[in-house]
Amino acid sequence: MNRTHNRNDRRRFLKLAAGLAGIGLLRPTTTFAQHEAQITRVIASSGQRLPLIGMGTSRTFDVTPDPAAMANLGEVLQAFFQQGGTVIDSSPMYGNSEQVLGDLLRRIPPPANLFAATKVWTDGEESGIEQMEHSRQLWGVDGFELIQIHNLRDWQVHYETLMAMKSEGKIRYVGITTSHGRDHDELQSVLKSHPFDFVQFSYNIGNRDAERELLPLAADRG
């Protein structure tokens, strides 16, 4: 590969990283050179620190659990834990992901401080409660640290359920998500009227619309 091209790519990446740090999107507590140290971020509602990088499971863990696929994903998960990873996020929407993840967690013991996060993605109070319990059983964990309302689906109903679960100590954090830019306006309205610990929405180099209103709103709401 052309060395000049590599240098240019690296230079662009470093400029982008510096820009993100400048607007507060990257707030590392250590330098990248400190291999053993974790780069963390504070959860505003509690003060708890989490590693800046977590493990997502959409598509990558949605596989047929044959020996080869499970072996490959097992290597990934083991390396993640060995490097200090603790945050894993999934959803019932992600096909086989929760089942595959749970099978792997039974083979590869997670760290004691595993931050298990999933979502509720259905309609109705009882269906939501049943789905969240099913997710817990698939994962094989005692409980979740975070449950988010996936893509705003029946959010008013699930919000009441999740806030009750939080007050009872069954979960630690409540969040809401959307992966669709067309729903950003509704998400803004929800965030203005209801407190959440976490919010997740589409934001990337190709789609920076969230910079105008969603990111400032999320920062203002803590």
Task: Show the residue positions of the predicted features.
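N-terminal secretory signal peptides
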Residues: 1-9
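N-terminal export leaders
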Residues: 9-26
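Short, acidic/polar
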Residues: 67-79, 125-138, 182-189
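Conserved, mostly hydrophobic/aromatic
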Residues: 43, 55, 88, 101, ...
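Active-site beta-loop-alpha junctions enriched in small/polar residues
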Residues: 58, 93, 119-123, 149-152, ...
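C-terminal segment of N-terminal export signals and the immediately downstream linker at the start
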Residues: 27-56, 66
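Acidic (Asp/Glu)-rich catalytic clusters
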Residues: 44-47, 102-111, 135-140, 166, ...
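Beta/alpha (TIM)-barrel catalytic core signal, keyed to glycine-rich beta->alpha loops juxtaposed to Asp/Glu
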Residues: 152-222
